[in-house]
Amino acid sequence: MEGANKKHISESFRLAAVLALVGGFLDAYTYICRGQVFSNAQTGNIVLVGLALAENDFINAIYHFLPVIAFIVGVIITETIKRRVKFKETFIHWRQIVIGAEIIILFAIAFIPMGRYDGLVNISISLICAMQVEAFRKVNGTALSTTMCTGNLRTGTEQVYRAIIEKSKDKVRIAAQAYGIVIFFS
């Protein structure tokens, strides 16, 4: 039972902060530099698909829908890695493979010039962001995201309310983590 209380580095605030920093940078990068596409949370892209369809702009609808498809594929890839890679057999944790894939893909993207291949970059980044959000779901036992802010903002606010009502220092800690991840994302 000794391992039951052991904290995983994959749930540490430090790692979550770094991943949130990367997540926020990638969202800003793809939106500002790569054709106004959101790479992390797909809500914005789904809204842009709807707007494009309302204007009968099918090319733009497809352009914004492809990252959504890549995100779905990223979740499936991550779940496949999680299911097939067993630490006892490989001596590598499945989350390390996800981080490794993220690093390799980002390294390759760094050499793709802006402009003509922005769609490929956006699809690739949406894929790795899905892998990240699927692999790193918790911070010190609390469900938080390193690639989007809405849920973290809700969790932080709820925990502040509960901290005041219940006079709980633990709720303050959770709220601080949630707001901290939002700050690192921005």
Regions found by a protein language model. Give the residues of each.
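Alpha-helical transmembrane segments of multi-pass membrane proteins
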Residues: 2-186
